[in-house]
Amino acid sequence: MLLLIGAGIGWFIESETPYAATWFAENGPVEWPQAVVVGLAAVVFAVCAWRSPGPLGTWCIPIAYLLACAIVREMPACESHFYDGGACIERSWKTVLVTTGGAIMLVGFFLRRHNLMAMIKPRWSFVFWPLGIAFLLLIVAEVGEKFGHEGIEEMLEFSAYIHAFCFSVWVFGQTRRPQPTGRSERSHVPFGRPIV
């Protein structure tokens, strides 16, 4: 449904309105809402990782990192020939940010190393299947770009980021704040089944 809605809106703006060239231009207006939404999703997943010290929270670490990388990707490079002003990040700093984020992710994995084997069990990994929908939307968006449909590409990307943000809010509701030492933290998975 998201695929059809996003593609339909993108196609309509692209083919039926005079604003497509401006709206979908490199560093155009659509880039900023995308960056904001994916940034919010990354923050929520990072908070979920802090709130849940178990496998659920451990899964949120790489997800937050990948979403943060998406923010860097959405921000224009200052050296780009398409850059025409506004906020930007130099390519060298993009590399620094991605590398630093990767290092933080590895530290998080090290601190949660006791969860690494548990997190790959279907009981935990299947919780995050909705992100596969966002990934599918991004793949179709890339196909749209290759065929010259920038409107479809950008709106599918936007749909993917909105979907990821909504899912991050759901995950937030399945986690609880860290409990004092000596008390086990309980979180929830679909259908209200509690798991430790």
Task: Enumerate the predicted regions with their spans.
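Alpha-helical transmembrane segments of integral membrane proteins, especially early/N-terminal helices
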Residues: M1-L2, S52-A68, Y161
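Terminal transmembrane helical module of multi-pass membrane proteins
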Residues: M117-P122, F126-P178, G182-G192
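Membrane-interface helix-boundary motifs at transmembrane edges
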Residues: V47-W59, R113-S125
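Juxtamembrane "helix-exit" motif on the non-cytosolic side of transmembrane helices
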Residues: F12-T22, M75-D84, R113-N115, V140-G148
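Short juxtamembrane and helix-loop transition motifs at transmembrane-helix boundaries
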Residues: P18-N27, T58-P62, D84-A87, M119-I120, ...
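Membrane-proximal helix-loop-helix units in multi-pass membrane proteins
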Residues: A64, A68-K121
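Alpha-helical transmembrane segments
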Residues: M1-W11, A64, L131-L136
